[in-house]
Amino acid sequence: MKNCIFTLLISIVLFSCKNEGCTDPLAINFDDSSNKNDGSCEYLYNLDIRFSLNDNDTKLVKNDIISFENNSFRIEKFKLFFSEISVANSTNTENISEVFLYNLENENTYNITASISQNNFTEFNFGIGLNETQNSTTPADYETDHPLGIDNDTHWTMSNSNSYIFALIEGKLDTIGDGSFFNRTYHLAHNDLLRNVSLQKDIIFNDQLNETIEITIELKEIFEGIDLSATIPHQSDNSPLAHQIMDNINNAFEVQ
């Protein structure tokens, strides 16, 4: 009888002792020895950022044609560098990626994923192009499949300097509507062409650990105010036209 009472007392003591900690197996600080949740659980939230080149609500692919201001443009190549990608709220900034290359011809570059520790943010920030440190490197400094590697064919060796092509747009243009297309190429490469973009978007993960945001690039807006019929050389220097196009790209983003 005494043994039974002793066993009962031990059981009561054991069950009355609460080991507080994180009891959620989904948390990164889950403690399987805890039997009472103390609200200390910490999580990694999965963010999927998807990019698309658009004509209004239509996502474009290679050889699609857009029409605007009596012009028709067939898009054949579109590459755009993003740098220092981050998300932020009023108190914290969290880095996503140092460099990312969107390539219309490669579906594997249509999105970037990241795990972040904050469960809400209000801004999505990035540079269009590369910072001076990144732009001073060469493909030989990277693995071949790195965004800055040789496989992506975005490095330009010029007579006076070397540079990555921040924005590459190639296609065919019809300015008179008779179906006769001629080549139109923009290769924008210069340190001064870097633009910083901040998109406002309230994202709250709530109880879910996964969230997706869509960032669109409106192709028509890139050509806003540009004389497409003019003869335009490769933009290997700091030209007014190059700045105008980069400014237009800066204004062509929308986050959904």
Each PLM stretch: what is its role?
Residues 9-12, 208:
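Low-complexity, intrinsically disordered/propeptide-like segments
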Residues 4-6, 13-43:
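Primarily marks secretory-pathway-exposed extracellular/lumenal segments that are disulfide-
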Residues 44-256:
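A short, solvent-exposed, low-complexity linear motif enriched for acidic/polar residues
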